[in-house]
Design a protein with these regions (language model features):
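Long, contiguous C-terminal flanking segments immediately downstream of a protein's structured core
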Residues: 5-159
Length: 159
């Protein structure tokens, strides 16, 4: 809940431009009965638009922002069950005592202001925040990774 989705260079035009989650029903191979599925509370998530998105993708994105349970935002793999079987309408009470809840937009701003390796941001932290704000990238992979997807930490300044 309340996640902020910002497309980067690699996924701005991908088919997952406004997907929050794809649910899979257990096939019975995970030490439980076949057909078991989870329950989900999906609300307050926000998708930022991107210039590379088509008009139809922007419409889907607007629909996902208006209703996080729309068919493009919350999918069920192979239509094994309906989304109504998976969604709950109220937050789970376990979150009440242990969480600080912000809107997606406020959480995004908090990450830009405070995320990093330590209280004092180093040059890598600063670069990552700048690239996040601008939707850009500096490095590509050494084994085929493009548009900011790296293949190893040696492709960047390390971490």
């Amino acid at each position: 809940m309340n996640n902020y989705y910002k497309p980067g260079p690699v996924n701005a035009s991908a088919k997952v431009h406004c997907r929050i989650f794809t649910a899979y029903v257990d096939d019975g191979k995970n030490q439980q009965a076949q057909g078991i599925y989870g329950k989900f509370y999906v609300n307050g998530n926000y998708f930022e638009t991107h210039e590379k998105l088509s008009n139809s993708q922007k419409t889907e994105l607007a629909n996902a922002n208006a209703d996080n349970t729309s068919s493009t935002a919350f999918c069920v793999k192979n239509n094994e069950v309906s989304t109504k079987d998976l969604l709950v309408s109220l937050r789970f009470p376990i979150l009440d005592d242990y969480s600080f809840v912000q809107s997606a937009q406020d959480a995004y701003q908090s990450v830009l202001l405070y995320a990093g390796a330590s209280n004092l941001r180093d040059k890598i932290d600063k670069r990552i925040v700048k690239e996040t704000q601008e939707g850009t990238f500096t490095y590509t992979g050494s084994n085929g990774g493009t548009n900011g997807l790296i293949d190893t930490q040696a492709d960047v300044e390390g971490w």
